[in-house]
Amino acid sequence: MEINIKEKNDSIILLNLKLKWEDIKSDYNDVQNKILSSSKEKGARKGKLRGIQKDIFLKNNRDYINSNFVDHALNSYYRKALQEKNIIPINQGNVSDLKFDGVDTDFEFTIEFEIRPFIDKKIPNYEKKVTIKTNHYIATDSDVDKALDDLRVQHATMKSHDEKGKLKSGNFIHADFTKLDDSGNPVEGGTLPNHNIKIGEGLFTGDLEKPFINKKIGDTVKITVDQDSGKVDYAVKINKIEEQILPKVDKGFVKIVDSKLKTVEELRKKFKENIQLNLDNENKKEFHNKIIEYFIEKTKFDVPPSMVDNYRSYLVEDYKAKDPKAFNEEKMAPQLDEISNKNIKWLLIRENLVEKEKIILGQDEIENKIKDMMNESPEYKKDIKKFYNEEQNKNKLREDILNSKFFNKMDSFFVNKTKEIATDKIKNKKG
């Protein structure tokens, strides 16, 4: 068997096989005899054709025999060639240039298939301490103030106004929202009863806030709201007005939030530390994402099309499941193609790096991680155990642990050159 291999690109192989009749004669006869053994002809027992009956049968069924041999030969010789050349395909493969005319003729075909590309020599020299630039945001007192305000809202109480109480910005109302037609008349079935909103927040700011200020229980306010379908008029009848009473930030409030703390200063310090920890983690995430971008950009190779197509199909199904109405596959096609290509490229690069750096994940590590989670949250022990009994969830945990070990290793090869930026500067830019 003559085997010729041509690399179409990094991930696509053209395999050409040529076999002389002498090499395939025995296999051809085996196929022919198998067909003869199951043949049924008048005047002869099943599989017992002799003489002229056999000759006539073979003549009449030669195309059928040839077709069966080709099916057998393609699979058999292709498999032998792969074993001989130690090649592992990752897709079905497409056959072309098939040449075989039956008895006494040679057999030749070409098959195109994909492989996982060999990228060892394409990986950049990352061991030279590559510098990655990132932004490192620093928490400020205004972050702490915002966190405390959010916490005060969580512990707030509501005070209802009497009929004389006037509505102020920041108050909540319970009101009937009735849609009006072009003539200003109520639309039948167009009332949203006792809807709860906060005046001075979200939609009800600016021009939509002003008509409500100083109104009382029982008053009706007419407003015009910009919606997707156009401007819509509403009559809003106020049924109830509530004022949000925020707790004072003092020692009593501190005790409610965290019984281990004693002073407001301690609470602010803890909040700031937690906020900074989150910002530090965001910086680390940015650092790792830029390491990924570095490898994707610097490692040049052709990604297997079938792997990209399969990942793209997964993305499409995932988007459809999450929000079928909003998802437009045709519109998102360029992004889907780019995301799929990048993810598969990174999958193959990381696979190579994990092997090169001998990053190993033992089964005990996964089980120990699950045990640690159960020990940390004993009240949820049964739920945690049940969750990780599902193979899909355990595989995700395995991937997370492997990813953590991988980036711990990569951290030693890359320098995170941070630019410290106070979060106040970001807020000022947005403002």
State the predicted function of each range:
Residues 1-431:
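FKBP-type peptidyl-prolyl cis-trans isomerases
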